């Protein structure tokens, strides 16, 4: 937001340097990016008058001019301009001067004739014909009656090119500061000066606006207020110099008096406005509605745009005439032959305007303001200000009254006045009276222990916001430095300790940690082959997604891990072993935030990895977390996993982990052309069952005995069942049991499989004999016979 110093002084009188103004405004919360004086690169250019014009003897297009610059002697300048005549008052760049763009002007000779400077065009002063409409674009700028023609006067002062422009960075929560009056209010409070913003009022009116215009709002949830006024006998002409100067200083190009009035009011009050040519408004009716399917509009920039049904438009009885809050239609613009206009001052839903502007690729000054949710109470005041300017500029005849359709919520924001809370929160000691005074300087009301925020401060929501206002104008530099009191007790929580342990175990097992987005596409569930009614498809939907690929929150991190494996596989990495402690999201209804469980997701592929590698990683994790009592069962009905190479680990009836080889179809859907393996381990179940303490086990004093056993059993018998029977039968003497072979094929009966275990036996009290080991083996063989298994011969 550019602020004109000259315009600012219309509302608040400040006697401070430009640097101090920038520093103090920044300190009070209105950040100044930069400030500069208009035409600062133009130096030693003054006002002069053409005394005589003589043809150059050696040129058919050059003129020798004698110029009076208010000095004792005239100066001679040679020019090629063809628009000059005697007595014209012009800008004169003297010897050793600089014009716009940093061009250095020195005296010299043109075809043998001395020239002691240069006569300037608008472009050489950094201006255009929009700044001085009566000037000639490609000729010397001849000063008009709206300029100071005192000879020898600095050109900056003569043509009003001496304003100081301050650029502010306005944050999204302070839409009120996207206006001159808003920044004037901040400046008045910062420098403790009087703020004067006159209430706009017009005097001359005729007729009744209802005879010219009617308004209907069909979408009150998207258009909170719409006010309109009519001006007849419009006299389209250039705006006066003072208005053009202010618009130029704020970065807006002057066009004509009617358009300039709408831009002037937008800059002054922060309320976007638009002027419609009434003759192109069919039925003389304004209808605020959503666009119809397939509807199009050609906007003021001459581009035809296809509208979508969710976009809000301003329409007449037959067609859209403007994209609400963004830009007017081609035929809504003001032309030289316009006679009757409608001024629009409205309040639209910020989210709707932002989405429309983004979809159409046309972010404008108006949409940039509407996006930030403006003050609906400002609509009428802005409309009255526009009518006042019409009267002041003699731009037309105002029709009496305004049409005002108001659906806005006028409930003010109120908060308790708690000075002590503010002091404790900020760390200052400011009296209640002083706090009240600060708030009243920025138009807050404090009565009976209640603070009422002004309608233009829609960013005020909490007591902390009030504290910020107090701190801003009390002075951040006055808040004393104070060391933090108390002792910071920095410790890991039990869950954080577990996560750290999990990470350490995974890294020690050779896995690399990854971090993936929690946003995914619904199509990922199709790639996982999840049924349409699967609970894992019940996702939290994003209201404003970056795109379809990031439109929902994942309920499982498996697709994210498979994407990582796919990326590595297709980059020709021969193997990958990854893990992530990943967050998933499970909806809990529209009134509650979603549940956010964490799971350990593991992904493997490569020749050296198989199902048992994955199982071994999880078993190591369970060992390190002290979980020894768990069950493993085969899984055949999970669409993600291979039906013959998947398992579920449960603890106390709760699923701790799901692991296995990825189903070939699922792997294909993720463009993985090799066997890959995934596991998902519940951090919640792991935390609930992790051992609280580690039990010390002394180093063994006696040697171990190792025996191998191979059994033949039905293919349907789970290996874990065999392991448990052996462990139960052998007892404490069994130190460890390891599965080292599963075989099906030749020499094994159909429907059967061979399972081989290695048993490690050790006693705490003695060295085991062969008889001891044989006795343990007999117990193991007898135990598995309960499951229909027999010792393989």
Name each region found by the language model.
Residues 1-207, 342, 361, 365, ...:
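Phosphate-backbone binding interfaces of nucleic-acid-interacting proteins
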Residues 2, 19, 27, 441-443, ...:
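A carboxyl-terminal module marker
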Residues 4-5, 23, 63, 196-295, ...:
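Glycine/proline-enriched, intrinsically flexible loops and inter-domain linkers
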Residues 40-43, 203-205, 487-493, 516-535, ...:
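Beta-rich nucleic-acid/ligand-interaction surfaces
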Residues 47-76, 245, 256, 262-331:
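Conserved mixed alpha/beta core segments that line enzyme active sites in large multi-domain catalysts
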Residues 114-131, 135-141, 164, 314-410, ...:
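Mobile "lid/hinge" segments at catalytic clefts and subdomain interfaces of large enzymes
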Residues 182, 415-574, 707, 760-762, ...:
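Extended, well-folded interaction surfaces typified by the phenylalanyl-tRNA synthetase beta subunit core
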Residues 187, 191-217, 394-422, 428-429, ...:
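Terminal amphipathic helices with adjacent charged low-complexity linkers/tails
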């Amino acid at each position: 937001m550019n602020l004109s110093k000259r315009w600012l002084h219309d509302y608040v009188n400040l006697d401070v340097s430009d640097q101090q103004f920038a520093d103090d405004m920044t300190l009070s919360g209105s950040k100044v990016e930069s400030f500069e004086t208009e035409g600062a690169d133009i130096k030693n250019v003054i006002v002069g008058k053409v005394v005589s014009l003589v043809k150059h003897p050696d040129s058919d297009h050059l003129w020798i001019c004698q110029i009076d610059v208010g000095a004792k002697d005239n100066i001679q300048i040679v020019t090629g301009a063809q628009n000059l005549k005697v007595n014209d008052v012009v800008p004169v760049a003297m010897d050793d001067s600089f014009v716009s763009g940093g061009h250095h002007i020195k005296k010299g000779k043109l075809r043998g004739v001395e020239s002691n400077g240069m006569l300037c065009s608008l472009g050489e002063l950094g201006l255009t014909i929009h700044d001085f409409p009566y000037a000639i674009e490609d000729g010397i700028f001849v000063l008009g009656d709206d300029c100071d023609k005192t000879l020898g006067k600095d050109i900056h002062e003569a043509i009003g090119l001496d304003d100081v422009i301050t650029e502010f960075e306005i944050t999204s929560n302070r839409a009120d500061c996207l206006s001159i009056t808003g920044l004037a209010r901040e400046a008045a409070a910062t420098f403790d000066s009087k703020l004067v913003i006159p209430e706009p009022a017009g005097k001359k009116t005729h007729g009744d606006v209802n005879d010219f215009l009617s308004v209907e709002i069909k979408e009150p949830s998207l258009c909170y207020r719409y006010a309109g006024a009519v001006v007849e006998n419009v006299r389209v002409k250039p705006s006066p110099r003072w208005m053009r100067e202010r618009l130029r200083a704020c970065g807006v190009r002057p066009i004509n008096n009617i358009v300039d009035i709408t831009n002037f009011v937008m800059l002054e009050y922060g309320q976007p406005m638009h002027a419609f040519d009434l003759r192109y408004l069919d039925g003389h009716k304004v209808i605020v509605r959503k666009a119809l399917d397939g509807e199009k509009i050609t906007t003021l920039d001459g581009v035809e745009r296809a509208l979508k049904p969710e976009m809000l438009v301003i329409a007449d009885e037959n067609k859209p005439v403007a994209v609400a809050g963004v830009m007017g239609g081609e035929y809504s613009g003001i032309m030289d032959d316009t006679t009757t206009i409608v001024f629009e001052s409205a309040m639209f839903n910020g989210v709707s305007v932002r989405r429309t502007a983004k979809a159409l690729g046309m972010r404008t000054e108006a949409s940039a303001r509407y996006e930030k949710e403006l003050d609906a109470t400002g609509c009428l005041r802005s409309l009255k200000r526009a009518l006042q300017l019409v009267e002041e500029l003699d731009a037309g005849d105002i029709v009496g009254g305004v049409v005002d359709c108001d659906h806005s919520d006028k409930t003010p924001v109120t908060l308790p006045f708690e000075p002590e809370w503010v002091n404790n929160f900020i760390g200052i000691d400011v009296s209640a009276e002083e706090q009240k005074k600060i708030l009243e300087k920025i138009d807050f009301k404090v009565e009976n222990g209640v603070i009422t925020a002004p309608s233009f401060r829609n960013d005020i929501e909490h007591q902390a916001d009030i504290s910020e206002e107090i701190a801003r104008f009390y002075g951040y530099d006055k808040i004393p430095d104070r060391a933090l009191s108390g002792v910071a007790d920095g410790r890991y929580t039990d869950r954080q300790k577990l996560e750290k342990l999990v990470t350490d175990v995974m890294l020690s097992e050779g896995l690399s940690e990854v971090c993936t987005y929690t946003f995914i596409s619904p199509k990922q569930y199709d790639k996982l082959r999840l049924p349409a009614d699967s609970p894992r498809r019940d996702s939290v939907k994003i209201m404003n997604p970056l795109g379809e690929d990031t439109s929902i929150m994942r309920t499982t991190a498996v697709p994210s891990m498979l994407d990582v494996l796919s990326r590595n596989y297709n980059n020709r990495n021969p193997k990958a072993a990854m893990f992530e402690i990943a967050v998933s999201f499970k909806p809990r209804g529209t009134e509650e935030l979603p549940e956010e469980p964490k799971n350990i997701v593991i992904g493997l592929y490569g020749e050296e990895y198989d199902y048992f590698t994955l199982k071994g990683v999880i078993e190591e994790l369970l060992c390190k977390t002290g979980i020894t009592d768990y069950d493993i069962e085969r899984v055949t009905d999970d669409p993600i996993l291979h039906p013959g190479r998947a398992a579920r680990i449960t603890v106390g009836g709760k699923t701790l982990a799901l692991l296995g080889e990825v189903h070939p179809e699922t792997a294909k859907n993720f463009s993985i052309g090799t066997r890959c393996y995934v596991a998902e381990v519940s951090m919640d179940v792991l935390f609930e069952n992790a051992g609280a303490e580690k039990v010390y086990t002394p180093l063994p004093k006696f040697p171990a005995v190792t025996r191998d056993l191979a059994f033949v059993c039905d293919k349907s018998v789970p290996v874990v069942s065999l392991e448990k029977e052996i462990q139960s039968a052998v007892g404490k003497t069994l130190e460890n049991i390891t599965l080292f072979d599963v075989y099906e094929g030749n020499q094994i009966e159909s429907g059967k499989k061979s399972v081989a275990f290695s048993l490690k036996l050790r006693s705490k009290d003695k060295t085991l004999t062969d008889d001891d080991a044989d006795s343990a083996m007999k117990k193991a063989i007898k135990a598995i016979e309960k499951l229909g298994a027999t010792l393989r011969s």
